[in-house]
């Protein structure tokens, strides 16, 4: 039985140790007739890589990182990577307008902002109004000039 005081990130690491080659996550994109899956070990490795990226950027315990993405495997990798650093993940609702994103981000005072390509227009409109954000990380094929590619950062 799991202790009631185990961090959720430790559950992921434990599953990677116990079931390294078992499928952890499956993502289906019916419109593209695409199916992706990753094992527990792959999931844990990618979470570690993203956590290390954030740490290298200066993110530390109790910092805040805004997380604005559509549901996907990358959403989970980013979320777990954020919390593995000890920082607070600040997930925002995908339905938020630019004004709502700016308001919530201003209240949170994040140091980093992770978003998927579906939100480029909304982030473009507010990014200059977020003085605490030092790094923007974009997920997907379209990466604006002011952001770094999530995928490329994971490759390093």
Short names for language-model regions:
Residues 5, 68, 113-116:
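Active-site-adjacent beta-strand anchor residues
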């Amino acid at each position: 039985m799991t202790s009631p005081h185990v961090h959720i990130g430790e559950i992921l690491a434990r599953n990677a140790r116990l079931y390294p080659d078992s499928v952890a996550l499956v993502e289906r994109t019916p419109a593209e007739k695409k199916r992706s899956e990753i094992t527990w070990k792959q999931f844990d490795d990618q979470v570690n890589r993203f956590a290390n990226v954030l740490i290298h950027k200066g993110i530390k315990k109790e910092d805040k990182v805004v997380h604005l993405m559509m549901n996907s495997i990358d959403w989970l990798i980013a979320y777990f990577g954020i919390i593995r650093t000890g920082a607070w993940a600040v997930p925002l609702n995908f339905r938020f307008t630019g004004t709502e994103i700016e308001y919530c981000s201003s209240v949170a005072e994040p140091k980093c902002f992770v978003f998927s390509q579906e939100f480029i227009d909304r982030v473009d409109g507010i990014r200059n109004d977020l003085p605490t954000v030092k790094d923007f990380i974009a997920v997907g094929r379209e990466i604006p000039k002011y952001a770094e590619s999530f995928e490329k950062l994971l490759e390093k």
